[in-house]
């Protein structure tokens, strides 16, 4: 079993290697970004189709995309920080795909709009998104370490 360092950046395992992106990496970032944006659109569409009334009352699609992105970023973050992952994979998956799939700006907007409609609803969404994102990231981290 992998033992995580005690401090946030204590130990070599959690110190990110510098990303040496160059112009050659832009294509990988663009390609990952296009797929991440398409995945985001698919998640939003699925949320709307599965529960149209609930979708109008609560931003389920953003919540689902951010939770999935938190899970996946923990997997790729663990691979990047604890094992070697090439610069192209890092550019494609982390900067491109996950950067397009998850959006903090949408989270902030939905939280504020929910708060304006109902402080309880806005608080539940804002707090729930944060908690779900952290739990998803923890699950991704633990799963990846278990598999490594």
From Swiss-Prot:
Cellular component annotations (GO), alphabetically ordered: plasma membrane
Substrates-to-products reaction catalysed: fluoride(in) = fluoride(out)
Main localization category: membrane
Entry keyword annotation includes Metal-binding: yes
Compartment annotation: Cell membrane
Gene Ontology molecular function: fluoride channel activity; metal ion binding
Transmembrane segments: 23-43, 61-81, 92-112, 120-140
Record keywords: Cell membrane, Ion channel, Ion transport, Membrane, Metal-binding, Sodium, Transmembrane, Transmembrane helix, Transport
Highest taxon listed in the record's lineage: Bacteria
Name of the molecule in the record: Fluoride-specific ion channel FluC 2
Gene name tied to this protein: fluC2
């Amino acid at each position: 079993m992998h033992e995580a360092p005690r401090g946030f950046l204590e130990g070599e395992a959690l110190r990110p290697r510098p990303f040496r992106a160059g112009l050659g990496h832009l294509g990988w970032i663009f390609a990952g970004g296009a797929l991440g944006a398409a995945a985001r659109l698919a998640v939003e569409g699925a949320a709307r189709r599965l529960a149209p009334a609930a979708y109008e009352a609560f931003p389920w699609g953003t919540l689902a995309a951010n939770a999935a992105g938190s899970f996946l970023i923990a997997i790729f973050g663990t691979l990047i920080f604890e094992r070697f992952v090439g610069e192209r994979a890092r550019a494609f998956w982390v900067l491109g795909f996950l950067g397009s799939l998850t959006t903090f700006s949408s989270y902030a907007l939905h939280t504020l709009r929910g708060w304006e409609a109902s402080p309880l609803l806005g608080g539940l969404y804002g707090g729930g998104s944060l908690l779900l994102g952290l739990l998803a990231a923890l699950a991704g981290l633990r799963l990846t370490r278990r598999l490594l």
